[in-house]
Amino acid sequence: MERKIGTRQIIFILSLFLIAQFIGLLLVIPSYSPSYSYANNAVPQQGGSVSFFFWFIIDIIIIILVLMLVLRYYKGNMFFRLLEAYIIIFGSFFFFMTLINDILPAIAIFPLSAISLFISLALLAYKIKFNKMRNLITLITSIGAGIFIGANIGIGFGFLTLYLLIGLFAVYDYLAVFVLKFMIPFAQEASKRNLAFMIGSTDLELSPSKSKKRMKKEDLEKIQNPEMRYIAERSGTPSISAIMLGNGDIMLPMTLAVGSYMISGNLFISMMIITGAGAGLLFTIFLLRKYKIGLPAIPPLFAFMSAFLSLAFLISKPRDPSLSILTGIVALVSLLVIFVTLRKIGKKKFEE
């Protein structure tokens, strides 16, 4: 059966993506007062954050190596469930901690942490028992993780370091899909197990009745549902309409938008980051529909965020021409790499 990305799936996934970005930004506005500027926070100001950043990078490298080994040699289910449990507890803890602090700003840290942990564990227990609400849980954990990383790296190191980190993730995503080739199998395993690592939408689309595309008799006989078979006989060829978006694809734009606001207090810059991310997601979907292969989402998102940042730094006050030029160059280089790679893939598929 043919697979494609339908209009309803595009609207659904784009809506969830943008809702997550705006919720993440709205949650930090009451809780954090910006205390740094782009200029005075270009280098680390807090010694504790240096240790956090170092171990954060080490953790990422270890996770990548473990994932590669697991996908190659491990055929069980326990590892994926443990990884899901860790992500749910980690992300949802900071989500509920920020949310409760917004509602009850006078609450002490101990009851705040205890309540947040209890809700996180309850959410995990629900997911384990019923294995439902994947999209909602993924959004909650992505928002929480985005706020946590944006706060620690953004405030501790400044905008340029945070921007560089997102760029490194874009490079990693590119390598994981096109070079190391373990990200697509990992996404497939996560989808098959319904793990809270991604949001997605899947539906059955049918061609219009005037379509010339018709299913063969032997294919029609394979459809066990009599109602669906009746519709397929009169409406043309059914196709699976599906799209998936990983939690990292949701978290990283939010990390940059949230961190940028917490550093400078410039809401316009954060809004431009989110707008660029939305445009990047639409561009990614366009590429998916055109090339019909699994693609990394973070590189296009990063390219369009950089392009919109370049414009933002030119028109915002105070203006920053140097950052505008830097992000503009990064956007052009990123898009060039994407187009060259896809052109090679398209040429290879044509030759085959």
Label every model-predicted segment.
Residues 1-352:
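A membrane-topology feature that recognizes alpha-helical transmembrane segments
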